[in-house]
Amino acid sequence: MSATTACWPAFTVLGEARGDQVDWSRLYRDTGLVKMSRKPRASSPFSNNHPSTPKRFPRQPRREKGPVKEVPGTKGSP
């Protein structure tokens, strides 16, 4: 029981001293909630932003390659 009591103060101290992400991941690993922490992290807005950025980059070069070939063809037709 004493371990649980020591964990609570660590949450506030570490959370206020460092950050919620670092503390949460470290505490989750210690408590064994790594599996649970992975689920909320995926639903987190931060996770959504990460995959969105890398997906946008590869989309730009792909779009350029596509229209580049169609642009000259469309211009020549009319």
Curated annotation (Swiss-Prot):
It comes from the Eukaryota. Expressed in chondrosarcoma, melanoma, cartilage and testis, but not in other normal tissues. The lineage of its organism: Eukaryota, Metazoa, Chordata, Craniata, Vertebrata. Residues 35-78 are annotated as: Disordered. GO terms for cellular component: centrosome; cytoplasm; spindle pole. This is Chondrosarcoma-associated gene 1 protein. It is found in: Cytoplasm, Cytoskeleton, Microtubule organizing center, Centrosome; Cytoplasm, Cytoskeleton, Spindle pole. May play an important role in maintaining centrosome integrity during mitosis. Residues 1-19 form the signal peptide. Keywords: Cytoplasm, Cytoskeleton, Signal. One of its GO terms (biological process) is centrosome cycle.
